[in-house]
């Protein structure tokens, strides 16, 4: 139960179901429990990262409820990513130079949850998305702040008033540091503010004797004013990046493009070294001035 990635009700008339969700790359099999929990299927993850579930013959019809968009939906549907614990993002902030390559210039844990999604015309839709985000460390010297771009979700698809209400309710101490922005292509961008460096220290939670404990995980609850396809809310569609203020220098993960300026930057050099790293697990960062390859020796080969 601790590693629950997906829970959903299935139409009793459905014999096979292909789910529009992404599975972390390291997972080879998922386990499907149904009925009273006494029957379990082992389902291999396909090469494209999807799974197909064969619905058992003894499926039971369940009652339905009505959504904000007056759609009938299954009552128990929930999708958690990464399923167990949190994912990790890490950045080096000296792009395009490699710097000390300790990958602790900016470190955060994240997760997300799609609650109450439903099927309509063979597509899967959601009206809510919860993103958990916790800044774990800041070992960089440059003034970067974190952002999350949902490239396939439009700013005008968000119910701003209700979203703001949830931000203030769930994050009373951090709400003013969470801003919802409209990107240059109309896309939805979440702007976050890094925490202050503790008195007497140069960095945040990276020095050997520092006693800083990260603040609790923020709960960013997005409410959509119209249904959004679940395919647009998957991990690969979330562009985590850091950027300087006033639309300055951006640093993205490999394969993602800059938001506010046109370029061919790929954020990877000719030796395949990167400036941003995302892992679907709770990864601990290296302390200051410890090379990442020393902390994680297998990283270079990978």
Residue map of PLM features:
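Extracellular distal adhesion/interaction modules in secreted or cell-surface proteins
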Residues: 1-302
């Amino acid at each position: 139960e601790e590693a629950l990635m997906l829970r959903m009700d299935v139409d009793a008339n459905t014999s096979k179901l292909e789910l529009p969700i992404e599975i972390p790359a390291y997972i080879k099999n998922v386990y499907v429990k149904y009925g009273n929990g006494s029957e379990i299927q082992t389902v291999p993850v396909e090469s494209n990262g999807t799974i197909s579930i064969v619905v058992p013959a003894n499926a039971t019809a369940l009652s339905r409820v009505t959504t904000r968009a007056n759609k009938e939906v299954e009552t128990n549907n929930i999708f958690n990513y990464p399923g167990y614990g949190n994912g990790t993002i890490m950045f080096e902030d000296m792009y395009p130079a490699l710097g000390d390559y300790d990958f602790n210039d900016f470190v955060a844990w994240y997760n997300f949850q799609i609650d109450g999604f439903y099927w309509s015309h063979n597509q899967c839709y959601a009206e809510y998305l919860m993103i958990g985000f916790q800044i774990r460390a800041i070992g960089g010297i440059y003034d970067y702040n974190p952002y999350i771009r949902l490239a396939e979700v439009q700013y005008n698809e968000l119910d701003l008033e209700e979203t703001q209400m949830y931000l203030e309710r769930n994050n009373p101490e951090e709400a003013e540091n969470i801003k919802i922005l409209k990107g240059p292509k109309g896309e939805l961008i979440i702007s976050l503010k890094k925490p202050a460096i503790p008195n007497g220290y140069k960095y945040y939670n990276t020095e050997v004797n520092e006693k800083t404990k990260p603040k609790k995980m923020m709960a960013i609850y997005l409410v959509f004013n119209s249904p959004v396809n679940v395919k647009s809310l998957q991990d690969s569609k979330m562009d985590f990046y850091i950027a300087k203020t006033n639309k300055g220098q951006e640093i993205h993960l490999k394969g993602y493009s800059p938001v506010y300026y046109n370029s061919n930057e790929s954020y990877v050099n000719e030796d395949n070294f990167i400036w941003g790293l995302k892992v679907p697990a709770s990864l601990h960062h290296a302390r200051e001035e410890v090379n990442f390859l020393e902390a994680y020796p297998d990283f270079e080969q990978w």
